[in-house]
Amino acid sequence: MKRISQSKAAWITRRNFSAGFGAAGIMAGTAPFNIVRGQGAALKVGVLLPKSGYQAGIGQDCQRGVDIAAGILKDLGLPPLQIMNADTETNVEVARARAEKLIGEGAQLLVGAFDSGQSSAIAQVAEQKGIPYIINIAAAPPITEQGYKFVFRNFPTAPMILRDAFVDQKEVFAASGAAPKTAVFMHVNDTFGTAMKGGIGAVMPKFDMPYKIVETIAYDPAARDLSVEISKAKATGADALLMVSRLNDAILLTRELVKQRWTPMAILSMGPGWYEDQYLKTLGKLSDGPLSFVPWYDPNKKMSKQLEAALAKASPGVNLNTNHVYTFEALLIAADAYKRAGSTDPKALAEAVRTTNIKDNVSIGPGIQFDAKGQNDKIVGGAIQNRGGKLLTVAPKEAANGKPEWPLKPYDKRT
């Protein structure tokens, strides 16, 4: 009973805050199509991801979520999806053009695109053409504030991410018996990073956090040298690094921390990069320790275990993460809606997506539903920590499979 009570209290706390803020198929490496089979006629799904450019590593990782969907969708008795892949090249205008091209080639539903700027462009095209669009990953709030009828997001907005990040940070601090008193906030200057910066100013004061931000440093996510930024952060003498980053820059920043011999008490990330498989494998023991407060999955859910098993078979040694989970769930939503709509008619599909009620899912929270704006407002974030090349969920307690290690082990003492 006590565990159930704690769980309910956690959901209520997070919901109260948000209320105030507004394979059976065969893949060919160069083939434009693959069939994710279930049963019945195939729904043509255009999947847009950044598979080249500086977000290529993440886009390619998201593709794994597409590639492992087949067996699970088949087990659920869902109809097949004909996947039409497109590379956004980490470029907003290319994303827009590729979305138009996919629709012209017969795509009946779109999925993508990881990046908020690219997803915003695709949303405009989808709404104009009247084609349902399910966002896998993108947090900029305006996307679901435009009154769109064909756009749906199964991913939290920046304020939702921050809400859960601060709730989970406090849980981690309490479990560790220690907390930073000061932090430097470093963020990418793209659409997502800018939205998160704005969100912090609005959200953080509501949580009475134990630390204050003493410096804010913005930088280009495509930068190849971040030595000046780390030097500036180190000079503040802050206890912790509060991060909103991407993959390549997370690797650069870590190498720079090592080079400049600075190990903060904690690295508290509220975005991608630090939990990526490429980050873990590239940096080895130097990747241990960062805490990521991000949209995640509940490792205790049945479907999470199915997804982990499917990924382990398709990509041995790769840890299940946000990229796979939310890309898979976008396809789960599409297949479920198609089955209920019984039609490829765009309006019927959109209405079916709108009335989604999936309780057996992967991400943390009570399931997948959309509000009047097309936003899943019931998603709950988690806290994960890199440990020995693995990712442990350390908060919230209801979804945890490990306890946090604190503080960050000095980089020069790792052998």
Give residue spans per PLM region.
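Hydrophobic core
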Residues: 25-27
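Extracytosolic ligand-binding ectodomains
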Residues: 2-5, 12-20, 29-415
